[in-house]
Curated annotation (Swiss-Prot):
Belongs to the EF-Ts family. SUPFAM superfamilies: Elongation factor Ts (EF-Ts), dimerisation domain (SSF54713), UBA-like (SSF46934). One of its GO terms (cellular component) is cytoplasm. One of its GO terms (molecular function) is translation elongation factor activity. Disulfide bonds: none annotated. InterPro entries: EF-Ts_dimer_sf, Transl_elong_EFTs/EF1B, Transl_elong_EFTs/EF1B_dimer, Transl_elong_Ts_CS, UBA-like_sf. Its main location: cytoplasm. Keywords: Cytoplasm, Elongation factor, Protein biosynthesis. This is Elongation factor Ts. Residues 82-85 are annotated as: Involved in Mg(2+) ion dislocation from EF-Tu. It holds the Pfam family EF_TS.
Length: 289
């Protein structure tokens, strides 16, 4: 068996990110063979990753990449359990490598990316002690595609017919700030309109009580029209110049907004509420496993 030197332990620590005692034990078990020790630790890491899989990952990062000719772009969301991990270099590297893979392979769905990156994901989970997941991915191709990334938490892709990359980015910035639900009023679903009507009637029950039916209908119509304008990108006042609507801005530049995609970290994920004492107890219990 090769001698287990301090230098060997140090090298294994640097290559795996694991603790000194874990590295020493792995080297002893592997007979001093560092490559075998790494393989064994990865196998062990896969087990740890499986244990972490049930933990809710609602933090993380959004990443975007646009082609040099602005004809295509990809946006992905990768989740972690804490925002702290999302700011660490190992996590950032995993996100960047995943984005490059998705872009290079022209992926339109997250499933093949998840499968391809599973080994790297398990290694990251084993190293950082948090659950990590590639959640979703969207690829957009068109005449002019632009993107905007707000920090690491909000990302937007905008697809234009006509126009230019600068306009696409400006509109993407607006989408990030204003969070429109639909492109235009014609795309608003009947379910969304019905829900808005129901909410309006419930909130204004006292005001409309005893009023004639036609008056109530006009009140509802006014609220629905306001909702359609607020929820539709093309009808929203442009954030940089509220005097012009986003749709008009595009039209003046000889462009038409074809579609947009907006990702925000953790949206739609139900995050469990855990009190601090319980969280500490859970971490202590996990450290003893």
């Amino acid at each position: 068996m090769a001698e287990i030197t301090a230098a060997l332990v140090k090298e294994l620590r640097e290559r795996t990110g694991q603790g000194m005692m874990e590295c020493k034990k792995a080297l002893v078990a592997a007979g001093g063979d560092i490559e075998k020790a790494i393989d064994d630790m990865r196998a062990s890491g896969a087990i740890k990753a499986a244990k972490k899989a049930g933990n809710i990952a609602a933090e993380g990062s959004i990443a975007v990449k646009v082609s040099d000719d602005n004809k295509a772009a990809v946006i992905i969301e990768v989740n972690a359990q804490t925002d702290f991990l999302a700011l660490q270099e190992d996590f950032k590297a995993f996100v960047a490598e995943s984005l490059e893979k998705a872009f290079a392979d022209k992926l339109t769905d997250a499933a093949p990316l998840i499968a391809d990156r599973e080994s790297a994901r398990e290694a990251l989970v084993a190293k950082c002690g948090e659950n990590v997941n590639i959640r979703r991915l969207t690829r957009v191709e068109g005449d002019v595609v632009g993107a905007y990334l707000h920090g690491h938490r909000i990302g937007v892709l905008v697809n234009l017919k006509g126009g230019n990359p600068e306009l696409a980015k400006e509109i993407a910035m607006h989408v990030a700030a204003s969070n429109p639900q639909f492109l235009s009023p014609s795309q608003v679903s009947e379910e969304a309109v019905a829900k808005e009507k129901e909410i309006f009637l419930a909130l204004n029950a006292d005001k409309i009580a005893g009023k004639p039916e036609n008056i109530v209908e006009n009140m509802v119509k006014g609220r629905i029209n306001k909702f359609l304008a607020e929820a539709s990108l093309v009808e929203q006042p442009f954030v940089k110049d509220p005097e012009i609507k986003v749709g008009e801005l595009a039209k003046k530049a000889g462009a038409e907004i074809v579609s947009f995609v907006r990702y925000e970290v953790g949206e739609g994920i139900e995050k469990a509420e855990v009190d601090f004492a319980a969280e500490v107890a859970a971490q202590l219990a996990a450290s003893k496993q």
